[in-house]
Amino acid sequence: MAAVVEVILAVMVVFLWPLTSVASSNVSSTLQCDKTNKRLATETISTPQATLKLACPSSTTFLPTYTGDAGTQTVYLTQDGSSTEKLQTALPGATAKQEDSQTNEMTLTFPQLPDTSQTVYFHCLGTENIAGQGSRKEVCGFAVTLTAPPPQGPQACVVPGTTIRLGIANEGDTTRFTCGGDLKLSPTAADKVFKEDCSTEESLKDLKRSEDKNSYFVLTATKTPSKTTHCYLCEPDPTKKGHNDKNCAVLIAVGAGSRPTARSVFGVAAPCILALLHFT
């Protein structure tokens, strides 16, 4: 019943928000809902392993409701809240956490960027009393956009069963990625790589693999590489209790004219397009 009420409230509040935009790379801050001006506070995240805290005013209700389980937590796919999706379906690997049930704050983590840019929305819903006019619904909210990584990265391979795609075209080009969580890179030898089938090991040619100070693996083209696709696997540690048997795959298209093919492993529901009415 609570879920039905939530949907009804979200659909009732249909509006055009002015925007308060903030562009970030690896966020670790709090985004405040602008209740006074009823603005949509926005954040753009362009690097993996980012953290963002969303704070609704104390007099409002955070929507979608916090479930306490990242697997069931939902988000809005449209600004008006008419379309919803599970958080981890829209943004693989993302988590949501509420430190205190008495606060209207939610902390989001985004370990891995999506294959295609994705925006999710949250609302802060309350009631405003107007002298002589009764009350009306008031709302502010958040729009959080995760951008798809460019061919050169950086990107993180974190979610078992998914694939990230990067690219190197010419001499001197680089691409950066890391294995997140407890996942370990395979092949381990710096001069080895898998073919596109992700199972046949071969020597790494025309490319050099190194590691930067942030524990990202860096592939650099020492000369213009032949056109092909390389694969690395981020594998779970079999000694870890309860480990996932699935790998996260890193496909790297190399050679002049190569472009990584964007393909989402998880289906993302397409937002329905509805007419937006002014909120008054």
UniProtKB/Swiss-Prot annotation:
Residues 257-280 form a propeptide. InterPro entries: SRS_dom, SRS_dom_sf. It is a lipid-anchor; GPI-anchor. The N-terminus is blocked. Coiled coil: none annotated. It is found in: Cell membrane. Its main location: membrane. It comes from the Eukaryota. This is Merozoite 31 kDa surface antigen. The lineage of its organism: Eukaryota, Sar, Alveolata, Apicomplexa, Conoidasida.
